[in-house]
Amino acid sequence: MGESRAARPLEAEALRLGLELGMTLIDTAEMYGEGEAERIVGEVIAGRRDRIFLVSKVYPHNASRKGAVAACERSLRRLGTDHLDLYLLHWRGSIPLDETLEAFESLRHAGKILDHGVSNFDLDDMVEAEALPGGERLASNQVLYNLSRRGIEHDLLPYCRERGIPVMAYSPVGQWRLLRHPALKAVASRRGVSPARIALAWLLAQDGVVAIPKATQPDHVRDNRAAIDLTLTPEDLGALDAAFPPPKARVPLAML
């Protein structure tokens, strides 16, 4: 989102439709379109900010004590709001974690963010972060997770569940590559719905997981909303597990 000026009207329309359909979590980042995505979101949420759970993310190279504060303030201006519900470190960089967490705590005490968390953190990163001041308040870890990328189920997801840290799953339909898999298409055909709806319904059924599918077109938004009401049968789940088995050993965290 925000990468093409020509696409902005359709992207804004998709966001508005999502809000009208009751999908009120909006995830963005200063990286997306180098701030343009935040500007689009700001235009759409004007006048209805109180209905929305707003998430944004800071670049790792901006995540110093002063840099994160300045980056957050820029995001707030682009979004046209005075606070974020959740502010995440987009991925781990060279700036020490304790410095980033200190900045997040400063922003929280100033009322500019309500909670903070991380993105693309593997298990060892989470353990390290939680041991630092402010790390005990981690409110989410946003990671790549879908039927074809189930590596987090071995250790990271159980760790987060045990500590009550929600996992936000990005790319829940595998950037559309997953949707061409014969097994997924077979389940979708049997249920009379799209493969994307099956993939999202599977993810939504996972305990402690919030799916954040990309939706820049209204028809994608409608399909995403419909996935909420779809319950997969034991037969569906068995077929999906056979085609996309859970991990038997630890694998490195996948990232996009």
Which role fits each region the language model picked out?
Residues 79-95:
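Active-site groove signature of glycoside hydrolases
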Residues 19-20, 42-50, 73-82, 105-108, ...:
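Acidic (Asp/Glu)-rich catalytic clusters
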Residues 51-63, 86-90, 120-123, 143-145:
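A short, structured active-site edge motif that brings together acidic residues
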Residues 26, 84, 116:
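Glycine-centered flexible beta-alpha turn that most often forms the glycine-rich phosphate-binding loop
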Residues 92-256:
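Beta/alpha (TIM)-barrel catalytic core signal, keyed to glycine-rich beta->alpha loops juxtaposed to Asp/Glu
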Residues 1-52, 165, 255-256:
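N-terminal binding-site loop/beta-alpha segment at the start of enzyme catalytic domains
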Residues 1-9, 56-66, 90, 95:
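Active-site mouth loops of central-metabolism enzymes
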Residues 5-18, 64-79, 126-127:
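Short, acidic/polar
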